[in-house]
């Protein structure tokens, strides 16, 4: 079964040192990949003129104060806007000080971003360098092909490894510079199309295009549709052919892209949609292309440049990970209390990091801290605090009460596990409830067992229900007026500096995205109706309503907090009730309903990245679309090759461990939700029926917090976000409370204590430290995997790799009551 998804100081710098150098005009020679409809010839280099000083404005002081009032109203409950800045806005409005109002307006709305995090890493000017070049397209497509193929192949292996976009961002830089050394600087004319293989030095805009292509191809992991296809082909014995596979895979990706484009006025253009993860990419782009040193007067005395610091930390992280990754694996989950009492059930339940509550969050492994949830240095402090609040309230306090009271037969089950269990305490054997045709056998189910979940897994489902209702109410209350205003104003909404700079370029039209979306929907109808999928066309209509309804609310939350809420549980829940007993329909419903929205969020994040880096929107449109379609073709081709050529692929005893873990999990989920169905798990009379109350809890609590925030707008209530409290824990399981606590401790250290005490250092180095730690870890992981795991090398055989894991917690045996052979627990009659 799938797990449910998942102070500042006064800082208005004009960044006088960053108005942009005087570059000579460069005329771009575009590489026409599609028709000229998607591209335009760039006009002559257009250096952006610095915005006039406050006193040079033509608008009256009254107009500026009115603009400030509108700004204050829109950002009154904005958790990312520093209170000091909001206080100054309020003071200017209250005193009617027009001159001060003009100064503040320019600082907050015209001259730069109102958010210090964005000001720290995103330049408030545009440099005219080419982005749509042969160099960018060739490097991007090659890396897209290699990354897609390698990731697809190794996703079939357990353990698996993946080439991430951080790796692409790193290796694309030397490849681009190497291209400059090899290719000639001359203009070519092929059938009337003119282009230059080396139109100047490899630049950061080309770099962004390459990374955007990789993000579109596999930024969210391998193509999710391949899990459905593997489950269908290998475990259910169905094969509808290559046409079905390609259309299914491409429509999943491109439906999300169409939605992302249509939603960009809500999720990309507004300054408040900061997309924190993009700030790390921006910092790394500028670091790789600019090796200048820092100004000690602005960085708490540090003069080391970002580039040099990145190399030092990245190399250090690369070398260090050999210890927790191979030499002393006990450093990962440093549960020393369990080492002292390895056979004590209560100790292992309370302090165990694998299956317990993990109330001793000490780790020396960055992969534990960032591997599941992402780097804790990225989300703003209030987001980290909300996630930790949800962990402590529900997964520690409430969960302990439930577990140690024996509710939901918890005495027979571990505190946490991503597995489902039968009434003998064993992992649920789905093959026992299927007939020879892999269809649900109710008689066999009644003779076998109902399905049971660990306490944390059950709690995670309840919180997932709460998150889905909370996000709609929260966004409606906190952002409803802004959404409606942006809808009415379309592209003519009030601009920040980055939006004004982007208006230099012709936009990708709304109707392009609309045509793409409608085309993908039409093809999807053909996919579900043209083959015997058991997926009714009317159910597909319901399926597509989910991402349409939830994309903007969930996207707003992610753009503000860096926390993504998932629709996986909701899609499983709905299809299980609508079309019970059809596993393939369940898998396809989940793929179109959940993954389309998830892909739309990844595309939106990349569109914001292009927005920050001033890449022409039409170049972003074409590069992401081409990369998505090509990547789907590559991954499906590799999948078919692997299934047909690798002996015993997807079997648990496959000699090289190509056991298809993702496809196997998807198959199990299809049986549980598509065959057993949610009615037998959550409806009246079922063990977990009480979890349905979380829908109401999720809908009610945002109203309470909103009323409190309205009454005390500058109190702690402005930072409370109930969707993040409920849904920020969506990766638990397979993540654990221990992992979340370790993540939270590091996040609070950097984004609260260091940010408040050493603000200049934090603004200059925080995001590049995050990128360096992640890059060093990823490169080290890849090297260890390819040199040691693939060669079946033996790990060092000592206590740090053996004895540290010989505890009840790691063995999954920290259980209060054990059954004798033949005994069962739970009711003998069940739904």
Set out the residue ranges of the language-model regions.
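Alpha-helical multipass membrane-protein architecture
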Residues: 2-831
């Amino acid at each position: 079964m799938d797990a449910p998804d998942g102070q500042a100081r006064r800082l208005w710098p004009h960044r006088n040192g960053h108005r942009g150098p005087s570059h000579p005009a460069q005329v771009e020679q575009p590489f026409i990949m599609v028709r000229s409809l998607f591209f335009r010839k760039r006009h002559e280099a257009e250096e952006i003129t610095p915005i006039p000083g406050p006193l040079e404005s033509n608008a009256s002081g009254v107009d500026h104060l009115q603009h400030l009032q509108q700004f204050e109203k829109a950002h009154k409950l904005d958790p990312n806007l520093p209170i000091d800045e909001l206080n100054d806005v309020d003071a200017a409005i209250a005193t009617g000080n027009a001159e001060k109002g003009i100064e503040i307006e320019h600082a907050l709305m015209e001259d730069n971003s109102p958010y210090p995090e964005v000001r720290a890493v995103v330049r408030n000017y545009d440099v005219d360098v080419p982005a749509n070049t042969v160099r960018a397209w060739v490097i991007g497509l090659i890396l897209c092909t290699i990354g897609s193929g390698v990731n697809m192949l190794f996703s079939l292996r357990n353990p698996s490894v993946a080439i991430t976009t951080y790796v692409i961002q790193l290796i694309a830089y030397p490849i681009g510079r190497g291209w400059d050394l090899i290719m000639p600087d001359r203009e070519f004319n092929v059938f009337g199309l003119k282009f230059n293989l080396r139109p100047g030095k490899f630049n950061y805009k080309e770099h962004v295009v390459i990374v955007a292509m990789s993000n579109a191809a596999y930024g969210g992991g391998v193509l999710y549709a391949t899990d459905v296809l593997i489950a269908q082909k290998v475990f259910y014995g169905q094969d509808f052919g290559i046409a079905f596979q390609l259309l299914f895979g491409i429509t999943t990706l491109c439906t999300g892209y169409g939605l992302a484009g249509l939603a960009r006025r809500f999720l990309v253009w507004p300054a408040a949609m900061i997309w924190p993860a993009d700030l790390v990419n921006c910092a790394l782009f500028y670091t790789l292309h600019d090796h200048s040193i820092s100004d000690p007067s602005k960085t708490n005395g540090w003069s080391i440049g970002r580039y040099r610091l990145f190399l030092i930390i990245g190399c250090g992280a690369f070398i260090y990970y050999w210890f927790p990754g191979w030499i002393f694996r006990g450093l990962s989950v440093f549960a020393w209390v369990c080492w002292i009492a390895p056979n004590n059930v209560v100790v292992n339940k309370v302090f165990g990091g694998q299956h317990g509550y993990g109330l001793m969050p000490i780790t020396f492994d960055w992969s534990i801290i960032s591997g599941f949830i992402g780097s804790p240095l990225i989300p703003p402090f209030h987001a980290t605090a909300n996630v930790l609040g949800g962990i402590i309230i529900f997964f520690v306090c409430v969960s302990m009460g439930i577990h140690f009271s024996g509710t939901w037969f918890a005495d027979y089950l571990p505190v946490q596990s991503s597995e489902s269990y039968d009434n003998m305490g064993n992992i649920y054997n789905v093959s026992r409830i299927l007939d020879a045709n892999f269809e649900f056998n109710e008689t066999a189910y009644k003779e076998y067992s109902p399905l049971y979940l660990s306490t944390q897994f059950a709690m995670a489902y309840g919180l997932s229900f709460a998150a889905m209702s909370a996000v709609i109410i929260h966004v409606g209350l906190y952002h409803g007026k802004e959404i409606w205003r942006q809808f009415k104003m379309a592209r003519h909404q009030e601009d920040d500096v980055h939006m004004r700079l982007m208006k230099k370029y012709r936009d990708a039209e709304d109707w392009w995205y609309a045509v793409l979306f409608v085309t993908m929907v039409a093809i999807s109808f053909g996919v579900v109706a043209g083959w015997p999928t058991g997926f009714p066309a009317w159910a597909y209509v319901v399926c597509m309503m989910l991402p349409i309804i939830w994309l903007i609310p969930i996207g707003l939350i992610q753009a503000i907090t860096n926390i993504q809420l998932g629709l996986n549980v909701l899609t499983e829940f709905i299809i299980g009730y609508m079309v019970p007993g059809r596993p393939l329909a369940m898998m396809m419903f989940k793929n179109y309903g959940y993954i389309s929205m998830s892909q739309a969020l990844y595309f939106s994040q990349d569109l914001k990245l292009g927005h920050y880096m001033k890449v022409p929107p039409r170049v972003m449109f074409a590069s992401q679309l081409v990369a998505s379609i090509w990547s789907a073709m590559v991954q499906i081709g590799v999948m078919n090759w692997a299934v047909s050529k690798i002996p015993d692929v997807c079997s648990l005893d496959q000699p090289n461990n190509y056991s298809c873990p993702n496809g196997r999990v998807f198959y199990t989920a299809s049986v549980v939700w598509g065959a057993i169905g949610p009615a037998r798990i959550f409806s009246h009379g079922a063990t977990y029926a009480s979890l349905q109350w979380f829908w109401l809890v999720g809908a009610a609590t945002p109203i309470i917090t909103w009323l409190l925030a309205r009454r005390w707008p500058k109190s702690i209530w402005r930072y409370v976000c109930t969707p993040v409290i409920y849904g920020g824990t969506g990766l638990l399981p397979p993540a654990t409370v221990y992992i979340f606590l370790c993540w939270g401790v590091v996040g609070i250290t950097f984004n609260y204590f260091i940010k408040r005490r050493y603000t200049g250092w934090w603004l200059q180095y925080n995001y590049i430290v995050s990128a360096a730690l992640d890059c060093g870890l990823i490169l080290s992981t890849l090297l260890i995997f390819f040199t040691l795991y693939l060669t079946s090398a033996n790990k060092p055989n000592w206590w740090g790799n053996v004895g540290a894991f010989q505890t009840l917690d790691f063995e999954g045996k920290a259980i209060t009551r054990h059954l004798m052979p033949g005994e069962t627990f739970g009711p003998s009659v069940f739904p």
